[in-house]
Amino acid sequence: MLFALPALNDNYIWLYQRENLPLIIVDLPETDKLFAWLEKQNATIEAVLLTHEHDDHTQGVSAFKKRYPTVPIYGPQECEKKGATQIVNEGKILTANYQIDVIPTGGHTKQHVSFLVDNHLFCGDALFSAGCGRVFTGNYALMFEGLQRLNTLPDETIVCPAHEYTLGNLAFAETVLVDKSAVEKSAVEKQRIFVETQRAENKPSLPTTLKLEREINPFLQAKTLEEFTALRKAKDIF
């Protein structure tokens, strides 16, 4: 089971569960909707994963810990002050029922991480559909390196970003694909139509796949740091 629970203005809380096992929660932007959903599902929780320190991913931690004090909350070092109980900057997390790869994807924040669980990539604000996160650290090399790590994963990887930014990202992608192939242009246009339909029905545009992102995401297509940096700076003022 994979479910994107809308939160705040455009966040998603991702919930992942193998059949008949406790679930994993990715990021805690808020808790009211989450607690209602968990109660309705009569869910048990294996762990919480925090991708980075920003408030719109962590401001629900305090309330969550009061209600579920024994559930481990994993996150990078920067999330310790936000309430993470288990610090993970890279490597693997082994819980009772899951093996989780921790992939460094800094740049948006210094210690941002992404989590890979059963071919599901929970990438926070590192990678979006047709886009990537702003480089608030100013370290474009760190951001580019993190995206390159994600770009080595298989095509069938299911990509679960933390925000509903897809339409705006596709609009930018269309402006920078003028020199791209007809196949790539067609993929962007086709995805834009799909996303417009989804959003008109108040449905998520996500998840996506790494195969699709390789076709429509200019930041994954960037071959050099210089190309990536120019794209990101252009998107900042788009």
Curated annotation (Swiss-Prot):
Q: Is DNA-binding found in the keyword set?
A: no
Q: Which Pfam families match?
A: HAGH_C (PF16123), Lactamase_B (PF00753)
Reaction(s) catalysed by this chain's protein: an S-(2-hydroxyacyl)glutathione + H2O = a 2-hydroxy carboxylate + glutathione + H(+)
**Annotated residues for binding of Zn(2+) 1:** H52, H54, H108, D125
Membrane-crossing segments per the record: none
What does the entry list as the binding residues for Zn(2+) 2? D56, H57, D125, H163
GO molecular function: any one?
metal ion binding
The protein's required cofactor(s) are namely:
Zn(2+)
Which intervals of the chain form a coiled coil? none
Keywords, A to Z?
Hydrolase, Metal-binding, Zinc
Task: Supply the InterPro entries for this chain.
Answer: Clx_II_MBL, Glyoxalase_II_hydrolase, HAGH_C, Hydroxyacylglutathione_Hdrlase, Metallo-B-lactamas, RibonucZ/Hydroxyglut_hydro
Its quaternary organisation is: Monomer.
The entry's family comment says:
Belongs to the metallo-beta-lactamase superfamily. Glyoxalase II family.
Function of the molecule: Thiolesterase that catalyzes the hydrolysis of S-D-lactoyl-glutathione to form glutathione and D-lactic acid.
- Its name, as the record gives it, is Hydroxyacylglutathione hydrolase
Q: Which gene encodes it?
A: gloB
